[in-house]
Amino acid sequence: MKENVFENNVAQLAHYIRHKCTNVRTERTVIFALACRDNIQLEIVVFYHQTYAAPLLTFRIWQLQVSDDIETRRLVFDQTLIDKLVTRNGSLRVDRRVDPAITLVDHPVLGKPFYQLHPCQSAQLLEDVALQGPESLEFWWNFYSSVLI
């Protein structure tokens, strides 16, 4: 995928993301969103990775707690929680041919620790499906968001 394809379709990708997430906003070519499941909130950041020429899905996990009508959230880095997010009843939530390689890295744009689905997988997926333009981004988002949300 070429960078200009991503840049030209950021608004369209943000539209797809709004179907599963809240508080979706864009800043130039970076998309920020929140998704909640149970007592977990995912802080999601999507942007174009120039080296791999593919979109990159990054996220952080926040544990939500309510006590005496006060909601608090705590940043969590826990492999058990990652395993819970990407599995359902002990089985991967995505196609078994896909290894959702989730790693913890310093975010290349924000400089804070985030989990990421490795961009080489995004590049390979987009190459395999051979879609172009906004259709490729919609396919990519639906495929990988199904792992987390």
From Swiss-Prot:
Top EC class, one word: transferase
Biological process per Gene Ontology, one example term: autophagy
Gene3D superfamilies (alphabetical): 3.30.1460.50
EC number: 2.3.2.-
GO molecular function terms listed in the Swiss-Prot or TrEMBL record: ubiquitin-like protein transferase activity
Cross-referenced InterPro entries: Atg3/Atg10
Active site: 120 (glycyl thioester intermediate)
Superkingdom, taxonomy of origin: Eukaryota
Protein family per UniProt: Belongs to the ATG10 family.
Purpose of the protein: E2-like enzyme required for the cytoplasm to vacuole transport (Cvt), autophagy and nucleophagy. Acts as an E2-like enzyme that catalyzes the conjugation of ATG12 to ATG5. ATG12 conjugation to ATG5 is required for proper localization of ATG8 to the preautophagosomal structure (PAS). Likely serves as an ATG5-recognition molecule.
Summary of subunit composition and partner proteins: Forms homooligomers.
Protein name as catalogued: Ubiquitin-like-conjugating enzyme ATG10
Designated gene of the protein: ATG10
